[in-house]
From Swiss-Prot:
Keywords from the named record: Cell membrane, Lipoprotein, Membrane, Palmitate, Signal
Lipidated positions per record (S-diacylglycerol cysteine): 17
InterPro entries named in the record: UPF0257 (IPR010646)
Protein name, per record: UPF0257 lipoprotein YnfC
Membrane topology (UniProt): Lipid-anchor
Annotated gene: ynfC
Lipidation (N-palmitoyl cysteine): 17
Residues of the signal peptide: 1-16
Location in the cell: Cell membrane
Domain of life (superkingdom): Bacteria
Family statement: Belongs to the UPF0257 family.
Species of the source: Salmonella heidelberg (strain SL476)
Cellular component aspect of the GO annotation: plasma membrane
Family annotation (PROSITE patterns): PROKAR_LIPOPROTEIN (PS51257)
One Pfam family recorded for the sequence: UPF0257
């Protein structure tokens, strides 16, 4: 058998041998919203998605769903945190996100569709020259956000009158596996927790299935919590 034909057959048999799509950076809106609303950022022409966090007992702990325009703006965003019995549902309307049920104006926007202010809580967001949210300032606290060269969120620091909480994430060196990461949480100079995540990816280098381990080091002995994350993503 000729070598080129053999390689062709091997490519047909082996998973991942088809041509991968070129990597796209994370948009300012996707990266910033993922920071504020606590979900894994996605890249590429995402049309709609859902992320479901499940405990090791198979119970849904949290779910995030969203729809995006072809320009990358969030048309809708819905979050349900079952562990803490909280949630919200937002729908885009010109320069605001409204509550999907009451239609009350909730979030004020800037630029194309970036976060600007949450008037009811007295929170304002500031962006850098590239449009990424780099800080959120409220009445009694300030949050500073950090990103890498591809726009991936790599940490945040929350400062209030009592302490300083920092989270620092280190993603995989493999550019196609950004959501494989380790993170460390500190209160002032004391480490209080760590997180490890590993995922399987689609052709856009977005996570499909992930395993998440959260270790609470603020108690002795430390307590580990194991989760799985199921992602459904549709593209344009």
């Amino acid at each position: 058998m000729k070598k080129p034909l053999l390689l062709t057959l091997l490519c047909m048999i082996l998973a991942g041998c088809d041509n991968p799509k070129s990597l796209e950076s994370f948009t300012p809106e996707m990266a910033s919203f993922s920071n504020e609303f606590d979900f894994d950022p996605l890249r590429g022409p995402v049309k709609d998605f859902s992320q479901t966090l499940m405990s090791e007992n198979g119970e849904v702990a949290k779910q995030v769903t969203g729809t995006l325009s072809q320009e990358g703006c969030f048309d809708t965003l819905e979050l349900h945190d079952l562990e803490n019995n909280t949630g919200l549902a937002l729908v885009l309307d010109a320069n605001y996100y409204r509550d999907a049920q009451t239609l009350e104006k909730k979030v004020q926007l800037q630029g194309k569709c970036q976060l600007a202010a949450l008037p009811s809580a007295g929170v304002t967001w500031e962006t850098d020259d590239n449009g990424f949210v780099v800080s959120a300032t409220g009445k009694e606290m300030k949050v500073e956000y950090r990103y890498d060269s591809e726009g991936y969120p790599v940490g945040k620091t929350t400062i209030n009158s009592q302490n300083r909480l920092s989270v620092t994430a280190k993603p995989s060196a493999n550019p196609r596996k950004k959501l494989d990461y380790t993170a460390v949480s500190r209160v002032d100079d004391r480490q209080v927790g760590n997180v490890t995540q590993s995922c399987e990816y689609d052709a856009y280098a977005n996570p499909v299935d992930c395993r998440l381990v959260i270790v609470d080091e603020s108690v002795k002995p430390a307590v580990s919590h194991h989760y799985t994350i199921k992602n459904r993503i549709d593209y344009y």
